Structures are given as structure tokens and as C-alpha cells.
Amino acid sequence: MDRPVLVLDGMSLTCGDVAAAARGAVQVELSADGRQRAGAAAEVAAYATARREVYGRTTGVGANRETAVSSGDAARHGLRLVRSHAGGGGPLIAAELSRGMLVVRVNQIAAGGSGVDPGVLDALIDAVNKGLSVPVPAWGAIGTGDLTALAMTALCLLGERDWVPRPARPPHFALASPDALAFISSNAATIGEAALACSDLRELVRAAITVAALSHLAVRASTEPYAEQVHAARPHPGQQEVAAAMRGLLAGPAGPAPRIQDPYGYRALPQVHGPAVDAARHAGQIVTSELNAAAENPLIDVAGQAVWHNGNFHTAYVGLALDALRAALFQTSALSAARLGTLVEPAFTGLAPFLATDPPPSSGIMILEYVAQSAIADIRRLATPAALGSAVLSRGVEEHAGFSTQSARATTDVVPAYRIVLACELVAAVRALRLRGIRPAGRSLADAFELAAGALPAQTSDRPLDGDVVTAQRLLPELAALLPPEPLPAERLPAEPVSPERPATAAGSPP
């Protein structure tokens, strides 16, 4: 079956695009403009290298930056560089993360600031479209460049390391020595991993609203806390968005609320889940900006015919945004568990403890609270900010690190844990609604209930619930899709690529 085509142009890649390409849902192509920008940058890089010192092209790297590459060694220096930097350690990262790295590096080079020979782009795209991955060890980067991951990629292109799985005709490109550092000096692996996590979490934080609405209906909670007037009084965007979504999902006739005030799991949902919505949106915007940035050091400025040595290799923005997202996810996960606690409590449901239907003291869904809290414990652990660390490296000349790589990895690990938390709440909410004989009045929530009730087993006697939790996890993307479109752009802070058409900002090489 033909797959949809994703065109990489260096300007418009989104987190969802990276996820689709990394997971084989689309075929990747390069735009003509992206190829042209990459080629123009390569020409300027060659021109500049012949006339001035350029870090990594005519010099060593790190603490060796003041050491010039001799003319007699120029053809071998780059190969030694990629070989020596392909030294990561630990287990290999997931294949989809490796392919995400390749997609991001193609788009970065197409943005037109690296100076790398554009011929490498075809080989990288070929690898993605064949479903290949680079064997990238998990440890080797600290948020200032994924040197080990990109060096391993370079060795795969050179034929010194095998692609995974090894194809009959491996993608091949002989990187020229001056292009070695320009190719590996990138955060493509970190940014690619962040993009996949942001894509997944954007979907889950939307699904969480639908799940919460089902729980709300099951305990006959009050809709008063979601009133528009309440949230106009404190107009945080995410808070207002969650409240509006709840008003829409719970629309329809409702009887008098049984309590003057509900527990925080319902009453404070907009105030607690809203920050997660905002944090997911902000992280997506930050990562999207990185996806389309020519964040190269040195930066090849085609318009100015200049080379700029700079600090755009540092990804503090990414790490801090992801750290904030994980903290927000812990808060809303705890609120999901609080709602689960009301669903097993007769005072809120009017049903037997733990929604059991066998003779007392049957356990019903008791174990789901333990499962959810186990996952939340991991979310709490993973919410520790990676940005609290730092490092001094390469004989003291690289004296700071933001550890965005570790932040991206922690955010990846949060995804399945948060998914489990929501799945436990969904299983409980659907069972409570069934047992109470309640059907949602609003179209979207009715669709959500019918979808979940049609997939989850109706049997309520004590039995293993692991299969229910797996099924509930699979339903979450469809529950997210039932919400109206987001009122604000999900992930669009475009970075203007370096291009020949951009007005010149530098007359020549900086001193």
C-alpha cells in the first residue's frame, strides 16, 4: 500500500510529522528548495574554508579548537573525528527514535546552515523509507550536541557500521573530511526524541479530558466549576480550554448536583490539567522551532557569505520545556488517581465498594488503584528536572550542559506511565456508568462512551483486568479525536531558515 508523502523542506516540519515518519506511516521526500538551500550552504562553506579558519573544518574540536589541521592531514582528519566520536555506551535506543533522528537531521540540513554536501540527504532519506535505524547507544550526549549518535550515523553511511536491519543495498554516502564535524554537530537525536514524546503527550492530554468527563458523569459531579464566568476571572489559556471542553462534553440536561462542592479531582480539573495542556503546547512549540532551525555551529550564512561561530548547539530551551511538561503531567496524573478513588467509593457512586458485583467482600476493580499509583510513582521520579545537572568537559572549555537529552529520555519514559494512569481511570469510569445505567446526553461524550463500552468487556465479576487496561490504552487516541480542534496552534513557532533569499545580516566573516 502506498504511504502518504511527507516533504521535508527545512521550514515546516512538526512533531507529528516526525512521529509519522519515524513510525513508518509516511514516505519521506526532500523539497527542491531544501536541496537548493543545502547546496548553497555547502558552496559558501567550501569558499570560506579556503580563506579563513573554520572550527572543525580547518581546526580540531573541543579543547583542540586552536590546533590547525595540516594540509597533508586534511583528507583523513574528518574520518578520524567520526570514528573517535562514535563511542556511546549502554543499550541501543529504540529504532523509531533513531529514525526520528535521521528525519530531523535531513530537515536541519535542508534549512541551509550546515554546509554539509547535500548528497548525504538522499542516503538518509533512503534509510528512513527502508525502515532502517542506526545502532545508537543510549548514553553519550548531554544536551550540547548528539555527537556519538551522529558519528555512528556517519559510520553507517561510510559502511563501517551496519544499518539495522542490514539491507541488501545499504544507504551509502562518503562524507568528505571537512563535512565530518558539520554533519555530527547536531542535536537531531534529542530533538527527534522530544518530537515523538510531544506528539504522543499532546494526544494523551486531550484524551484525559474525555476520560475525566466520563468519570464526572459517573459520580454525578457538579458542572458549576466549569462555568465560563469562573475561568474568565482567571484566564489562563489551558485552564479555559479544559473548562470549555468539559462544558461541551457534559452539555445536556442534568439533575441537581448531590454535593455543594466536589473533590478536587473534578472541581479543580481545569486548574490542574490546564497547566499540562499549556505545557504540552509550549513544549511542542519549542521543539517545532528546533525542528526547523539551522542550529549549526559554525553557522554557514549564505546571504552574508559568512561563517558564524556560536552557541546554538545548546538546547536549554528544549530541556526546560520538557522538564516543565513532566512536572505538569505528574500533577494531572495525581488528579486522575483521585478521580479513580471516587469511582471505587460507594458514597460517590451509590454502588458496591470497588464497583464489585460478586458477593462481599469481592475486590472488583480494587487493583486498578495500585496499578495507577505504581505508574504515578514512576512519573514522580521522572519529573525530577534534568536541568538541575551540569558538567565541565574537554579540559574546561565546555563548562556547561543543560542535559536536554536526559530530559527528552525521561519524557519518553513518562508516556507509557501516563497512558496507564488514564487507562485505569477509563476502565473504572465505563464500569461505573454501566452499573449505574447512565448514558451521556451530549453527542461527543456519548460517542466516547459507546466507543469504550463497545471495546471493554461487560463482564463485572472478579477477573483479571490486565486485558481491559491494554484495551483502554488503545482507545485513548480515538477519545482525544472526539474533542474539538485546539483553539491555539499546537506546535508552530517557525524558525526562518538560512537561505540565499534572506536579507544579508553580515557583510563578511566575524572576527
Give short role names for the model-derived ranges:
Residues G113-W139:
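FAD-binding glycine-rich core of flavoenzymes that anchor FAD
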Residues T67, G87, P91, A110-S114, ...:
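Short gly/ser-rich anion-binding loops that grip negatively charged ligand groups
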